[in-house]
From Swiss-Prot:
Location relative to the cell: Plastid, Chloroplast
NCBIfam families on file: PRK05309.1 (NF003698), uS11_bact (TIGR03632)
Stretches with biased composition (Basic residues): 9-22
Assembly notes: Part of the 30S ribosomal subunit.
Record GO terms (molecular function): rRNA binding; structural constituent of ribosome
Protein name: Small ribosomal subunit protein uS11c
Pfam family, one: Ribosomal_S11
Keyword Cell division carried by entry: no
Keywords noted in UniProt: Chloroplast, Plastid, Ribonucleoprotein, Ribosomal protein, RNA-binding, rRNA-binding
Biological processes per GO annotation: translation
Protein family membership: Belongs to the universal ribosomal protein uS11 family.
Amino acid sequence: MAKAIPKISSRRNGRIGSRKGARRIPKGVIHVQASFNNTIVTVTDVRGRVVSWSSAGTSGFKGTRRGTPFAAQTAAANAIRTVVDQGMQRAEVMIKGPGLGRDAALRAIRRSGILLTFVRDVTPMPHNGCRPPKKRRV
């Protein structure tokens, strides 16, 4: 009769969830990318390593509702909730894009209790580069 192979648990040593410990991040950079169709909020440390991110799509909004200010506010709140738990107190904000979610995301960041050192608009502006797409006719 064959020997029974002992079952090896994937949760050895009682560890559940991620293997890395939660880092303490006192200062970070919050990147808000607001397009007309979606808003993406990424929180990084000062070296540029991503700590947390969220978007209007991952927050549960689909279709044209992703471009709304309320969706951007929800995405910003979701991204910041995890880093506040990791001890972030101060942050810089970089806002990129022409979308409706710019101001709503910034309001949600201000309301979270993180002290903002500065807010910078880093929207790429062409110095007469590529030809823009033709205007829509609806």
